[in-house]
């Protein structure tokens, strides 16, 4: 028998959803069966699968040991002795991290250890702000993600309530995200709005731009303003009103101004001439608008954060 004590970050979850996180090797169908058979109890008594857990509840799980074997990559953050994070801002609820271009956000086939999320977990674990043995189901998480070869601001939630609020606010478009990019040529008009539809091509890992609705296409809206043009390159500020995969890269390529260094949508000969192997794109400014109640994060309303430095801006525009 294993027993869990519900702490603040685990509270207010349905019992069945908590089990999916706390015991990931236990299939959902089997969890429901064991709840019915009273092999899973709350405070020593039978509970329904939709029971809302409360802080201080004690769960008794009469399950075989194999369901509690840790996944092989679960504790990989422990191998990071010196976590490397560029922290723009930190408080008791969130961190704003300035991710360098080239660092992957989450593990993929090419990288399992050196990821932004693993450095985050190692940092909080070593500060003793995150204690996995006490949390049961909650793990600090990143709230937005950007491509490996794109740098910029990534939001991290330290606790479950902050994660819930941020996910809701991102979904409701109550945060404003601004990017800097360098594109080829000068966009005309120099300031404008791009509305299109993007459809993913899983075979090529790219998206295709359409100017009319298409099956599986998702609407994309982008605002841009050209800040400076020099040597047939333009520095452009972009605001995303939607957050689609490769939205900026594909939209600018479609209007004839691909990003410098972009290996998927750009011009190879130009990239080689400038010696750029990563797209000149950086998530450099973030504003917490929060026009509606943000609960424990209300103190962030109206606050704006800007990355300390955008490497390609200094290189090409001084």
Where are the regions that the model predicts?
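RNA pseudouridine synthases
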Residues: 1-202, 306, 311-317
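Short alpha-helix capping/helix-loop boundary micro-motifs
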Residues: 43-48, 232-235, 272-273
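Thr-Gly-centered strand-to-loop micro-motif
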Residues: 43, 106-107, 157, 210, ...
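Short loop/turn positions at the edges of beta-strands in beta-sheet-rich folds
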Residues: 91, 150, 230, 240-244
